[in-house]
């Protein structure tokens, strides 16, 4: 099991849908979140993409310099950059970060945003172009280790003599992650992707998606790894966790929810449609209606696009729900919580000790652990706190 955190380059807050409790985007804060994730033993961080975010490549490059082990899941956008340019960017980042790059292929689903960036392809054509983009990207980086060049003639993209002179450290290329819920997305994942990501739907729905991707992968003689994107709201008691969930959306009003849902309804995204269906387009607002599966809460999606569900509960319950997803075949969990700095600590301290040995070991054996840090404050100048009971 690998646990990732999230860098909130679009801003952060204690509440959704209001400026109350909000934190402005700034590098000092993003650095705090990244260093916390690195220090606490998270495997890596997802850096989001889109017009509401700071540029992920610039942010990742800056954060790589202030972290030691943390991996960076960074977006490439077919249609917005050439595949050979993206290959050079990936190779350079991988080299300067000592092999800490992971690629998140993002086709996009917001028509207004895509058109604002000059991309006017429909859904089917975007996936055709994305498949061609990824074929070129993968081939160019694989060939770079031997100094070879690549020719490719496709419907949307063509290159002749494409090459990268300085290959990435990871062979044949940094691993590719990708999420999508439509049939073309599953086909693309099965053919070319290393790890398929899904947003946090109920386990039965997730299992169906994973099985479909497996079928596509089998046609190409491949196997694909799986990951899930979720928010988390964990507290020492179940009641406290649900109170925190209610508090997160306590500042929302009907107009704010309606305006957000109108934007989502105009998106050309099967994944966003499935997220909206979980809360009936914002019309389900009670805790009972928003708990769409045991401890899986759709309240975040009332106003947040993309990943709109959270696991809510005490540490043991949240850990058990993660194990349920792991039993489906998921081994990468990309998590987040509001505010992201405090919740990175809270999740690591409360849930990491309950996760598989590989995760616990990273948290327990962090370099530089001292008695006055993770073991608590030394009392009366010489009394070390007793060990917690696991």
Swiss-Prot record:
CDD domains: Alkanesulfonate_monoxygenase. Its EC number is 1.14.14.5. Belongs to the SsuD family. NCBIfam families: alk_sulf_monoox (TIGR03565), PRK00719.1 (NF001939). Catalyzes the desulfonation of aliphatic sulfonates. This is Alkanesulfonate monooxygenase. One of its GO terms (biological process) is alkanesulfonate catabolic process.
